[in-house]
Amino acid sequence: MKRLDDQTVVGRYMHPQAYGFNWGDKGDKVQFVRSNTMEVIGDEKVIAEITPYDKETIQGAKEFKITFVNPLDAAISENEGFGIENLEWCPEVYFADNVIRNNRARGTLFSTPLKTVVERNVFDHTSGTAILLCGDSIGWFETGACRDVTIRENKFINSLTNLFQFTEAVISIYPEIPNLKDQVKYFHGGEGYPGVIIENNQFETFDRPIVFAKSIDGLTFRGNKVVQNEDFPAFHSNKTRFRLLRAKNVVIENNEFSDGDASVSEE
């Protein structure tokens, strides 16, 4: 991203497999995210004008000149990396009554700040994590934080049989944050939002990790049943049910563990 003046930037599609289509329209609300800490900088901005910058038309364009109605925050410049998230183009998600089976990588991936409900699904032998809540502005450039996610009444059968990307647990809340130690705000959840609620699910697992969560304010795990089996040899380096990195307002209650292991590690 390059700042041209106090109200104008040139934004660029960064991933080589995603460009050449419209990014935003006049009147759209956007926010700026510092790539290094994945924190929102300044207030929401409204697009006054947006045009292709490196091409005459949108087709094939990688760069857009974007002018905003109001001035930008002084911290936003090309001296450090920023992502621009279009808040108008974020969907609500209802994902229900599906069978997700034998995936090579993750079973499902959700990355939207709007309401997301995942219910009554069967996640059967997903090779990687069954459910991934991600977010990044350095590789895939999927910036969206999750504010309101409910995961309920699903069945997980021997997920996490391999170690692909983001395979920290059956449910992996894994934003990529290069400089986590200097992060002040939290990425997922946040004050005034429900955060992530995982309730009334059944986990059948041969290994230990059930939930991994990083940079989240608001995580509830309640009323779930975890059934340990010996279908495969346990192999994961994470030996705890719940591994938390910079997590706040976490509730783990009223769950059933067939082997009594409800271990938690906090970092």
What are these regions (language model features)?
Residues 1-267:
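Extracellular parallel beta-helix/beta-solenoid repeat domains
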